Amino acid sequence: MDFEKLERKICDFINSCVDNARAKGVVIGLSGGLDSALVATLCQRAFASAQGSASGLQSKENAGQSTLQTDKEQADKKASAQDESPKNAEQKGIFALIMPTQNSNKANLKDALMLCESLNLEYKTIEIQPILDAFLSECESVCKTRMGNLSARIRMSLLYDYSALKGYLVVGTSNK
């Protein structure tokens, strides 16, 4: 499988969805797990590639041989791409919401915060336990499954609220 080609296809899809919705960026629920970390990273790469400013070493074809671009070559390419882009083009944003409960894994929370820092993401941490407790105080015989489902619904509501606030699309992740 050609993973670079697959990544480009996914990044193109992300950009297409955001552009077609005329959104300014994406909102993602970041748990610290692999699924949300991968989606956040793909969104960042998608938006960077749309601006012609992908970071890191990039491969290129040179007479049939794969070589690595130097930092200077990448900087020159980035400057050239910026010169060609419209002056009013805005960088698409990524806003991460970290929404732990009292039962959330502390290591995952730490991982989510580290990912936000390493990807330079705008983020907000919202402790959803008080919201969960207020709702559960009105319910009868709450089991673990109902608590888990309610936590997911609260997170979804917050994601869509921030989506509307910022003019962003919600990017979903699975929990597999």
Regions from the language model: what does each represent?
Residues 1-176:
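ATP-dependent adenylation/nucleotidyltransferase module used to activate substrates
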